[in-house]
């Protein structure tokens, strides 16, 4: 994956591929397959959130898919308001259906939106997480700008993805965004019973805005 800008034709082709995967029956198939594979990673996110000892606040899951992680967070932390955003309207519809069944609507909200233009005001969230979504982003600079924009001063940004995502790629993109100068921590992480670390975690802590 590269962080360069892409042409409209290539971008349209990529979006068509994502629509095939994440709309209609594809959203149901995704829920029943990927959720089982990513459950250990979601448990790691819950553990990382618990370490913050948040007393209330708002958490955003970017690329939420069917909203499994959002509901996991809402159940684990009753004092948090949890939001999920995804480009796929079918995924968001599925997430809302599941949330209604689990009676979590009072503290959970799902929105259709693009990581390059998030549907939230500036400085909205205490923590933003994204799991296994970054490798779908066709460029990194604008998504990082948007994540910075909606994060509160003192907020945390955590991006979890496959280990093949290189830190140098993120650092290069960060240099062209308001995140420049903010320290990025990264580490390989193990989850579940996997003997090897198959995921990488990128983390930022915005102590204050420049």
Predicted features and spans:
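Conserved alpha-helix/loop element of class I SAM-dependent methyltransferases that forms part
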Residues: 37-56
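Conserved SAM-binding loop of SAM-dependent methyltransferases across substrates and taxa
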Residues: 66-77
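Conserved SAM/SAH-binding beta-strand->alpha-helix loop
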Residues: 88-90
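Conserved SAM-binding loop
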Residues: 95-96
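Conserved SAM-binding strand-loop segment of SAM-dependent methyltransferases
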Residues: 103-116
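A short acidic, Gly/Pro-enriched loop at the edge of an enzyme's catalytic core
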Residues: 116-127
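A short glycine-rich, Lys/Arg-flanked "PGG" loop and its adjoining helix->strand segment in the class I
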Residues: 141-153
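Conserved beta-strand signature within the Rossmann-like core of class I S-adenosyl-L-methionine
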Residues: 155-161
């Amino acid at each position: 994956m590269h962080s360069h800008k892409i042409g409209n034709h290539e971008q349209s082709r990529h979006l068509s591929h994502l629509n095939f995967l994440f709309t209609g029956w594809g959203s149901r198939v995704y829920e029943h397959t990927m959720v089982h594979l990513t459950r250990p990673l979601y448990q790691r996110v819950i553990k990382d959130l618990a370490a913050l000892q948040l007393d209330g606040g708002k958490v955003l899951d970017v690329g939420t898919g069917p909203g499994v992680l959002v509901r996991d967070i809402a159940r684990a932390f009753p004092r948090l308001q949890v939001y999920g955003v995804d480009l796929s309207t079918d995924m968001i519809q599925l997430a809302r259906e599941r949330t209604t069944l689990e009676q979590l609507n009072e503290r959970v909200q799902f929105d259709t939106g693009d990581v390059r233009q998030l549907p939230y005001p500036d400085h909205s969230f205490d923590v933003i997480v994204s799991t296994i979504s970054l490798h779908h982003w066709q460029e990194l600079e604008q998504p990082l700008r948007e994540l910075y924009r909606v994060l509160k001063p003192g907020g945390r940004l955590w991006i979890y993805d496959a280990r093949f995502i290189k830190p140098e790629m993120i650092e290069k993109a960060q240099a062209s965004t308001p995140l420049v100068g903010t320290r990025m921590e990264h580490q390989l992480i193990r989850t579940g019973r996997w003997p090897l670390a198959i995921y990488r975690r990128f983390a930022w802590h915005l102590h204050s805005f420049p």
